Amino acid sequence: MVPQAKLVVASLILTSALIQTSEAVGGIATYWGQYTETEEGSLAEACASNLYSYINIAYLNIFGEGRYLSLNISGHCSDCTFLGEEIKACQSQGVKIFLSLGGPYGDYHLTTDGDADRVAEQLWSSFLGGSKSTGVYQPLLGDVELDGIDLDIQIGPPEEYDVLARNLKDLTKDRTRPFYLSAAPKCSAYNDSDAYLWTAVETGLFDFVWVKFYNDTSCQYNNDTAAGLDAFYRSWYDWTVSLAEGNKLLIGIPASNETDNSPLGGYIPSDVLNDQIVSVIMTSSKFGGVNVWNRYYDLKTNYSSSIILEYVNSGTKYLPLRTKFMYQNA
């Protein structure tokens, strides 16, 4: 017997999907840069794996208050300008490369609109193809024009990131290469003006929102099929109806059921993800795919491979997803 609440939530999702039916095609995103080259491989290797449509270089974790920008790409490099050639190779393969701002550690914050203005100028000049202005230009990744900026803000005050987003979109509006903004809010940040990134996401400027459905017990999958799926579905539906048309929502999940030292709640076995989640939500025009945390764990578990092989013909990065009503045999 299927719980009534479960059916109601699934019905809401499916009704929304039918209203906005489109050819739902998703991609896989991941984060690279927080482990050594021996542990997670190079950026070039990640791109050549043919697993990912989007790769976030993590992290730019010092910015704001008029300071110079600083990267923390753990164990890979101190002088990371050589990555410029790897980034260009990735882009030539169709992989979109983002620079992720924030992370769990660092010294970053925006205190005023002027602060957000300056950081936007620094990013534009250093990573996005803008003018190489003296005092602003820092070629930390070499001479590159990245595809996008990702916000994974986890510490400091939550204000001013909406201003940063507006400034970045304005600065990049005339460039030839499309510019993308992405954000990685916690699933519980929905409709919470005090939460990281909610106010920014409300601007409607974020092309990709890869919501973290992990480390957040109120809205993540919690192993028990009925209760775990209900929490996920309710949160997914809330986020779907809140996003502006054209924004894509990706499922942010860990590629392993534990970190080095402690459980990483929210892990979804790939068979559950494929058969009981993606197959239900993929008809929404806002479905954008899956964001896997992170390249290191993905290499250990081959998690992305298990998703791709379920849905994709050999040789393509994208997931043309099948239609299936989860409760057809209920």
UniProtKB/Swiss-Prot annotation:
Keywords: Allergen, Carbohydrate metabolism, Chitin degradation, Disulfide bond, Glycosidase, Hydrolase, Plant defense, Polysaccharide degradation, Secreted, Signal. It is found in: Secreted. Residues 26-330 form the GH18 domain. Residues 1-24 form the signal peptide. It catalyses: Random endo-hydrolysis of N-acetyl-beta-D-glucosaminide (1->4)-beta-linkages in chitin and chitodextrins. Residues 72-86, 300-311, 309-320 are annotated as: Binds to IgE in 70% of the 10 patients tested allergic to Indian jujube and latex. It is an enzyme of class 3 (hydrolase). One of its GO terms (molecular function) is endochitinase activity. Disulfide bonds join C47-C90, C77-C80, C187-C219. Its EC number is 3.2.1.14. One of its GO terms (biological process) is chitin catabolic process. Belongs to the glycosyl hydrolase 18 family. Chitinase class II subfamily. This is Endochitinase Ziz m 1.0101.
